[in-house]
From Swiss-Prot:
Residues 1-10 have a biased composition (Low complexity). InterPro entries: Bles03, TIF_eIF4e-like. Belongs to the UPF0696 family. It comes from Bos taurus (Bovine). This is UPF0696 protein C11orf68 homolog. Residues 1-60 are annotated as: Disordered. Disulfide bonds: none annotated.
Length: 292
């Protein structure tokens, strides 16, 4: 299984997690879900359309500012549970040690981390870095913008397919507290048990605000795979609104309120109590069509 994750290699030492060595991190994040310094990432906002920046601020910032914040988070050490190296029996202790509502972005003597942490991540035994041609994608994007040709969802989809930058993620926004920690624990267990591939959660920002959990899939064009991941997230106990964003938008710095008036998220999922056996209703946002 080729994992679609923003995860760093080498985690799992020392009891299943810890701050990652920079050289290990740069070697492992070579694929499309790996929100790297080459890619633009995380736009915070009140609308549930984008990833929240690990910096935690929510409105009034340009895409360039948000990309810079996200890049800084990506360069800082991560806390990672790597099921390829660490027994699953150690997961509960790791989760108890690093609850995302308590891990702070820049470190604090009273928090589990005294040094900055960019992300907290978990990935399963099938994690295989596979980035696609991100540099080629970004070069083609620059050429498209200078050509004056229209920028449309179809254009971006074709760029992603051409350069094999196909990963995407379900986004879950929650305020710091029990619900966030509970949701993250359920998702991390699903990753380690093989029901999901890779996931990460932002640490708590100094300013407060919502944190974001990102759950990755290999291929945003594989609708069945995207829906299966949604079902696994619901089975893990998550009941809030989810939105799904292809990583091609992330790498190209396309956020909500962008100059092309594009919606960066393809799908939204709403929990359905006592309704569908799968536990949610998923909407294709571009076409306003229910998929489940």
């Amino acid at each position: 299984m080729a994992a679609a994750a923003a995860a760093v290699a080498g985690a799992g030492r020392g009891g299943g997690g810890g701050a990652e060595p920079r050289q290990e991190r740069s070697r492992a994040r070579g694929w499309a879900g790996a929100e790297r310094s080459e890619g633009r990432r995380m736009e915070p906002g009140e609308e549930l359309e984008e990833e929240d920046s690990p910096g935690g601020r929510e409105d009034g910032f340009t895409a360039e500012h948000l990309a810079a914040e996200a890049m800084a988070a990506d360069m800082d050490p991560w806390l990672v549970f790597d099921a390829r190296m660490t027994p699953a029996t150690e997961l509960d202790a790791w989760l108890a040690k690093y609850p995302p509502s308590q891990v702070t972005r820049y470190g604090d003597p009273g928090s589990p981390n005294s040094e900055p942490v960019g992300w907290i991540a978990a990935y399963g035994q099938g994690y295989i870095p596979n980035s696609g041609d991100v540099q080629g994608l970004q070069a083609a994007w620059e050429a498209l913008q200078t050509s004056g040709r229209p920028v449309t969802p179809g254009t971006l989809r074709q760029l992603a397919i051409t350069h094999q930058v196909l990963s995407g993620k379900w986004l879950i926004h929650l305020a710091p507290g029990f619900k966030l920690d509970h949701a993250w624990a359920g998702i991390a267990r699903a990753v380690v048990e093989g029901r999901l591939q890779v996931a990460k959660v932002s640490p708590r920002a100094k300013e407060g605000g919502r944190q974001v959990i990102c759950v990755y899939t290999d291929d945003f064009t594989d609708r069945l795979g995207v829906l299966e991941a949604d079902a696994a997230i619901r089975a893990a106990g998550v009941k809030c609104l989810l939105t799904y964003k292809p990583d091609v938008y992330t790498y190209l710095g396309i956020y909500r309120a962008n100059r092309w008036h594009l919606c960066p998220t393809l799908y939204e999922s709403r929990f359905q109590l006592g309704g569908s056996a799968r536990g949610s209703r998923v909407l294709d946002r571009a076409n306003n069509v229910e998929l489940t």
